[in-house]
Amino acid sequence: MRTGLITAALTLIPAAAFAHTGAGEAHGFVSGFAHPLGGLDHILAMVTVGIFAWQLGGRALWLVPGSFVLAMAIGAALGMAGVALPFVEFGIAASVIVLGGIVAFACNAPIVVAMGVVALFAIFHGHAHGSEMPIDAAGGTYAAGFMLATALLHAAGLALGCAIGRTTEGRAGYRLGGGLVALAGLAILANTV
């Protein structure tokens, strides 16, 4: 009963209010935070980075996601500066395909290789974030927003990787999940062509 009342009350909130996040510093942070969460391609890639890091274990748990966030910041700076980067949408779609495949096949790459792979893809994701920054958003807080959202998506991937790995069918779960992510990446790629 109580859940039903809360749900009914929430439906009365005008959705248009969520389309306007404000102006200035707060606007920048909220817009930046929302950007990675607004695209399935970003969500799939970033959560899958966390799962990949979990599969590798050890220092990869923080080095792999950390290299993604750092490289994404570099890509965003390029995008904010108006530096053209070819094939951004293709690179983002490829990241979903490749990362899904890496998880599905449980690729046991050296940490430095894993960091390089995710960093390469992160440049494309970052460029998309940076080049799509709202004109009235503050750059620093916008970047802080999408970097925090990305780190949280990585953390969700780490938690999901842990949860899948603890099941008796963990290996099959990684294969199925990674395969579905790769298939979604193919659909995203087909949509960008």
Language-model segments: residues:
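Membrane metalloprotein/metal-transporter helix-bundle signature
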Residues: 2-193
